[in-house]
């Protein structure tokens, strides 16, 4: 198991280098879209992540697989960066590098990530309303929603923005009421 501080020491320089490279080349939006694609592919195919993380697989085999999977899908500079991660035996941190890149990208654009949990899926109008309220609350220029469902909430919404949690769920209200009555 790798500690989070060690992972951060490994992940941050690569993510920052990707942001710097993309910015210097005027490719921030391209890299962002490509990194979202890479993260989705790795998440959708656990075998790919296991293959890339395996210390038994040679770097050359990993680079060949990266070439086959991503060559026609992502920018060549980003593909070369993935190959560099493989050469440096850091490809097992690919998911974390992608996440950190997206965090840095949001920070550059003054966009906040709001993790929204509801009992049932939100309509587009509800999502837009939450975006507007979060934008007003945070003074950010944009809001990226990450939605999930939890039927145990019974109703309402829980919004997490960074380390702040806004619990407007029925479950949360019932819990607070029970604490007041106790």
Curated annotation (Swiss-Prot):
Keywords: ATP synthesis, CF(1), Hydrogen ion transport, Ion transport, Membrane, Thylakoid, Transport. Pfam families: OSCP (PF00213). It comes from the Bacteria. GO terms for molecular function: proton-transporting ATP synthase activity, rotational mechanism. It is found in: Cellular thylakoid membrane. InterPro entries: ATP_synth_OSCP/delta_N_sf, ATPase_OSCP/dsu. SUPFAM superfamilies: N-terminal domain of the delta subunit of the F1F0-ATP synthase (SSF47928). It is a peripheral membrane protein. Disulfide bonds: none annotated. GO terms for cellular component: plasma membrane-derived thylakoid membrane; proton-transporting ATP synthase complex. Belongs to the ATPase delta chain family. F-type ATPases have 2 components, F(1) - the catalytic core - and F(0) - the membrane proton channel. F(1) has five subunits: alpha(3), beta(3), gamma(1), delta(1), epsilon(1). CF(0) has four main subunits: a(1), b(1), b'(1) and c(10-14). The alpha and beta chains form an alternating ring which encloses part of the gamma chain. F(1) is attached to F(0) by a central stalk formed by the gamma and epsilon chains, while a peripheral stalk is formed by the delta, b and b' chains. F(1)F(0) ATP synthase produces ATP from ADP in the presence of a proton or sodium gradient. F-type ATPases consist of two structural domains, F(1) containing the extramembraneous catalytic core and F(0) containing the membrane proton channel, linked together by a central stalk and a peripheral stalk. During catalysis, ATP synthesis in the catalytic domain of F(1) is coupled via a rotary mechanism of the central stalk subunits to proton translocation. This is ATP synthase subunit delta. It comes from Synechococcus sp. (strain JA-3-3Ab). The lineage of its organism: Bacteria, Bacillati, Cyanobacteriota, Cyanophyceae, Synechococcales. The gene is atpH.
